[in-house]
UniProtKB/Swiss-Prot annotation:
Cellular component, GO, one term: cytosol
UniProt KW Ligase keyword: yes
Note on how the cofactor is bound: Binds 1 zinc ion per subunit.
InterPro entries, per the entry: aa-tRNA-synth_II/BPL/LPL, Ala-tRNA-lgiase_IIc, Ala-tRNA-ligase_IIc_anticod-bd, Ala-tRNA-synth_IIc_core, Ala-tRNA-synth_IIc_N, Ala-tRNA_ligase, Ala_tRNA_ligase_euk/bac, DHHA1_dom
Designated name of the protein: Alanine--tRNA ligase
GO biological process: one example: alanyl-tRNA aminoacylation
Keywords carried by this UniProt record: Aminoacyl-tRNA synthetase, ATP-binding, Cytoplasm, Ligase, Metal-binding, Nucleotide-binding, Protein biosynthesis, RNA-binding, tRNA-binding, Zinc
Reactions it catalyzes: tRNA(Ala) + L-alanine + ATP = L-alanyl-tRNA(Ala) + AMP + diphosphate
Compartments in which it is found: Cytoplasm
Organism expressing this protein natively: Brucella canis (strain ATCC 23365 / NCTC 10854 / RM-666)
Protein function: Catalyzes the attachment of alanine to tRNA(Ala) in a two-step reaction: alanine is first activated by ATP to form Ala-AMP and then transferred to the acceptor end of tRNA(Ala). Also edits incorrectly charged Ser-tRNA(Ala) and Gly-tRNA(Ala) via its editing domain.
Entry GO MF terms: alanine-tRNA ligase activity; aminoacyl-tRNA deacylase activity; ATP binding; tRNA binding; zinc ion binding
Domain remark text: Consists of three domains; the N-terminal catalytic domain, the editing domain and the C-terminal C-Ala domain. The editing domain removes incorrectly charged amino acids, while the C-Ala domain, along with tRNA(Ala), serves as a bridge to cooperatively bring together the editing and aminoacylation centers thus stimulating deacylation of misacylated tRNAs.
Record lineage: Bacteria, Pseudomonadati, Pseudomonadota, Alphaproteobacteria, Hyphomicrobiales
Amino acid sequence: MAGVNEIRSTFLDYFRKNGHEVVPSSPLVPRNDPTLMFTNAGMVQFKNVFTGLEHRSYNRATTSQKCVRAGGKHNDLDNVGYTARHHTFFEMLGNFSFGDYFKEDAISFAWNLITREFGLPKDKLLVTVYHTDDDAANFWKKIAGLSDDRIIRIPTSDNFWAMGDTGPCGPCSEIFYDHGDHIWGGPPGSPEEDGDRFIEIWNLVFMQFEQQTPELRIDLPRPSIDTGMGLERIAAVLQGVHDNYDIDLFKALIRASEEATGVKAEGDFRASHRVIADHLRASSFLIADGVLPSNEGRGYVLRRIMRRAMRHAQLLGAKEPLMWRLLPALIREMGQAYPELIRAESLISETLKLEETRFRKTLERGLGLLSDASENLAEGDRLDGETAFKLYDTYGFPLDLTQDALRQRGIAVDTEGFNVAMERQKAEARANWTGSGEAATETIWFGIKDKVGATEFLGYETESAEGVIASLVRDGVEVPSVREGETISVVVNQTPFYGESGGQQGDTGTISGEGFVIAVKDTQKKGEGVFVHIGEVTEGTAKAGDVVELKVDSARRTRIRSNHSATHLLHEALRETLGTHVAQKGSLVAPDRLRFDFSHPKPISAEELEAVENLANEIILQNAPVTTRLMAVDDAIAEGAMALFGEKYGDEVRVVSMGTAKHGSKAGKAYSVELCGGTHVRQTGDIGLVRIISEGGVAAGVRRLEALTGEAARLYLEEQDERVKAIASALKTTSADVLDRVNALIDERKKLERELADARKKLALGGGSSDGGSAVEAVNGVNFLGKIVTGVSPRDLKPLADEGKKQVGSGVVLFIGVGEDGKASAVAAVTEDMVGRFSAVDLVRAASAALGGAGGGGRPDMAQAGGPDGAKAADAIAAVKALIA
C-alpha cells in the first residue's frame, strides 16, 4: 500500500519526467497578494503567470501545494472532524501549462497517471465535462476509451471556472472514483449526487477564454491548463479506504493523540481526535509560515483553529496542553517533504503550548457559562445571540467554537443576534472614540494625488533638491498660501525627504523659497505615493506653485541610515543564531535608536545575544559595500531575499544586500538580502558599531530587541565604562577587579545572612522570648510550645517547628513569624504520637483566623497558613491553646 509521501513523490516524478518544472509549494500566506487570506489552491502562486503579468523560465510546472481553507469564502472549519473529507489544511497536487499543451495532453497525462502509475481500475472511473465542451468529451473517448454514459455533461458553473467577473476562464473536466454500490449516492448530475459513492479526485481546468465584459468572452491567444488533485483524497482511494482520516498520515496523528490522552478514537471521541489531528497540521504549518495567534486577520483565524482543537482536547480529558506534544508525530510524517516544519519546530511547539496554557482557564469558565445558559435548551432550540457574543467578547470564544460545543446536542446559535450584538458594540466604540481628527482628513490626499500625481522620491541619490509646491494644506483644508507661524502640510512635485514607512521615521529639514522658510518636522506617505512634509512656516509667505529648495537634515538622516542597515544585519544574525523561523514582526528606525520585533518563542540567553551582536559587528568590520538592485519580486525571493509575507509589492522591488557570509550554507554569498525601500549606509563600516541594550517579549511568540549604533553606541559604552569606574571607586578596587570584588561581597553577605538566620533560630528556640509566647508549657496535660518570632522568613518556620517538636518530645508546636510589613505566617506541628488527637491543619486554621486570614493547609503533622494582622499573633497562640484545652 502506497503511503502519502510515496503518492506525492510519484505524482511529482511523473510530471517531472514529462517535462514539468517541479516548483516548491509557496507559503500559506500568499506573496504579493494581501487580498487573499491564505493560499487555497495550487494555481495561486501562478496567478500572474496565467494573466500575463509575469513570465517564468518554464512553461510547464507541477507542485504539491500547501493549502488552508478556514475563514472567508473558503471555510471548511465547521465541518472538520465530522465528515470524511473536510480539512482546514490539505495538499493540492497539480500540473500547469502556461500556453504550452492543452486539453488533449492534459487529459492524456491525467489518465495515464491514475491508470498506469497509480493503477486505478478503469471501470471505477468516470468523468464530467462542461455541456458544450465537445473537444474534451471527444478526447476522453479517444484517450481513455470511455463510453458516452461515463462522460457526463454538466451545464452548471460547477464545470466552468472563472478567476473573477473578468479575466481568464474556461470549462472544467472532473475525474470521479466510484467507491461501489455498497455506499449510497449517484453520479454527478443525478438527484443522488450529494451521496458519497462517487468522489471527485481530480479537476482539470481548461483556460481558453477571456471574459472581457459580462456579455463578451473571447478566445485566449495562449490557452493554459490548471489542475488540482487533493492528496488526501487520492491517498484514500489508493489505500482502499473511503474516509480521508483513515489514511496512513492521519492514522499516525490520531494514534499519537490517543496515546497522549489515553482515550481511544471511538464513539463520541472519534470526532475530537480527528479535529485535533487536522488542526495540528493547519496550526503548525501556519506558524512555520510566519502566522502567529492574534485577535485580527490571519492571526485570528489561526487562533480560532487552535482554540477549537483545545476545546476538543478538553473533551478528551486532557489536563495539560496537548497539541505541542503531538508535534513530533507530525514532523515524522511530513518533515521530510516540508523541512520548514523542522526548522520552526521550537517556535511551533512554544506557540502551541503557550496559547493552550493561556486559554485553558478561560475555556473552563466559558464552558461553564455556556452550560448554564443552555441547560434548559432542547434539541432544535437556539442559543441566544447575546450569550454567544458574551462568550466571544469576555471569554475569547470564537462563534464557531460555541457552535461546535452545542453541535452534538442539536442546538444551534442565533447568529443574527450575535451579529447584532457585535455591531452594537462597534457602534458604541465609535461613539465613545475621540481622536485627533486626523482620520477625517485622510481622504484629502487621494484628491490631491488625483490632481497633482504621485511625488517623485529623489532621496536615494541626494539629500537636497529643487521642486515646485504642488499643494498646501492647513487644518485639513487645501489653501492657496500659508504664512509665518502656521502649521501646515506641503506637497512638492519631487522630494529628497523620506516619508515614514517600513518602520523608518520620516525625514526632517527645511523647504525654502523666495522670502520664506518652512521647518519640516516630519514627512509622511499619504494616499498612494503622496509625500507630505509637515512643519511650520518660520519666515514669510509660501504659495502653491512656488519654486523651492528642499534640504534634508543630513546628520539625522545619517544616523537613521546607520540604524536601518544595522536592523538588517541583526535580522540575519538572529536567523543564523536562533533559526530560520525568525521573521520580522515590526520595527522602528529612529535617529537615536532602533527597535526590532521578531518571531521567537522564548527569551534569548545572554550568550545568544552576544553571538547575535558579534555576528552583526563582524559584518560591520568588513566595511563591505551596501548594494541596491531593482528586480522582479519572484526573482528576488528566488535569490534568497527576505520579504514580509502579506505585504503588497510592485512589479519591481528594491533589493538591499550587504556583507559576505563566512559561515554555513551562505558562506561566500551576500550576508543579508532583503526587500526594502528605506535608506541605508554606503558601506557597512559606516555603521561603526552596533550594541544591543535590551531584549524582551511584547506578545506571545514575539520578542523585541533595542539597539544603538555609531556615536550613540559609543556614548552608551562610555557611560557604562564611567559607571564601572564609579562602582570600582566605591568598592576601593580597580575596574579590572570590580567583578571579583562584587562576588566577594556577595559571598560575604550570604555568609552573614546564614549566621544571622542561625542566630535568630537559636533565639526563637530559646527558653523565653521578648516577642511574646513562652517556653514549653502544659495545656490540658499536653506539652505546648508557642513562639512569636521576627526576622525569620516563612520558609524557615518549618525547620523551626521541627526543632520545636524535638524540644517538646510529645505535644504541639506553633510558630508565628511577623514580617516587617505587619503580616504573619504560622506553622503548626504535632508530634507523631499526638496526630491521633490533634490535626496540624485544624490548629493552623484557628491561628490563621485569629490573624485575619482564611484557610491553611498541609499534613496532619505539619501545616502552614498566614494572615494580614501580625499584631494579633498572641491571640493566635491563645486560639490554638484553646483548641488543645
